[in-house]
A protein has these predicted regions:
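Short acidic-capped amphipathic helix/loop micro-motif used as an active-site/signal-coupling element
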Residues: 35-38, 60, 64, 142
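Catalytic core of bacterial c-di-GMP phosphodiesterases, primarily the EAL and HD-GYP domains
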Residues: 54-123
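Active-site core of bacterial EAL-family cyclic-dinucleotide phosphodiesterase domains
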Residues: 1-46
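Alpha-helix-loop-beta-strand connector modules within alpha/beta enzyme cores
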Residues: 180-181
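The catalytic core of metal-dependent phosphodiesterases that act on cyclic dinucleotides
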Residues: 99-170
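Intrinsically disordered, low-complexity terminal regulatory regions
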Residues: 1-14, 50, 70-75, 90, ...
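Conserved protein-kinase N-lobe ATP-binding Lys motif
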Residues: 36, 47-50, 80-85
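A cross-family glycoside hydrolase active-site/sugar-binding cleft signature
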Residues: 13-15, 31, 77-81, 112-114, ...
């Protein structure tokens, strides 16, 4: 696939991801925002089946560009849409070029997906394997909120699992939630 016109612009905000035992920021999650300061919803509402691939590609490039411009020293975690990726080794080329252009080591890139849509587990496993082969880390975001189950943890072997907020809410006072976590 060649470059596609997206039809709208957006920027990134970087939210720290904390390693609690170490009590330090170890990465920054790149979150889409409107150029007018609006939230992710205003941007994501413009993503369609027709522009999903272009949006996914632009998110990766924009996250690296903005992190480099801002002097981010931690790893950058980039959300991706597995259903926008038709062939992992081909679809990652634009990201690799952006990383090289900005001297951003692939070891400082984490790709994470949210289980917001039905995903073919075999396809996702191929993506994870290719990304790991390149040197990226892979993560599941909002685990426990979507379509996947514990089997995905065993099969996908993510480097990082970010639990859904509703799963950990009141974990200190709820023995069942604590046991799950």
């Amino acid at each position: 696939r060649g470059p596609q016109k997206l039809g709208f612009d957006f920027t990134m905000a970087f939210q720290p991801i904390i390693d609690l035992p170490q009590r330090r920021v170890f990465a920054r999650e790149a979150l889409v925002r409107g150029t007018d300061g609006s939230g992710a919803g205003s941007v994501l509402s413009q993503v369609t089946t027709a522009n999903r691939y272009a949006f996914d590609q632009r998110c990766s490039v924009k996250a690296i560009e903005e992190a480099a411009r801002l002097g981010v020293e931690d790893a950058v975690s980039i959300n991706f849409m597995p259903n926008a990726i038709y062939e992992p080794s081909a679809c990652i080329r634009t990201t690799l070029l952006a990383a090289a252009r900005h001297n951003w080591p692939v070891e400082r890139i984490i790709f994470e997906f949210t289980e917001a849509e039905q995903i073919d587990p075999t396809h996702l496993q191929r993506i994870f394997e290719e990304y790991r082969r390149i040197g990226f880390k892979v993560a599941i975001d909002d685990f426990g909120a979507g379509f996947s189950g514990l089997r995905w943890l065993a099969d996908l072997k993510p480097d990082i699992v970010k639990l859904d907020l509703e799963l950990i809410r009141h974990v200190d006072a709820d023995p069942r939630r604590r046991a799950i976590v």
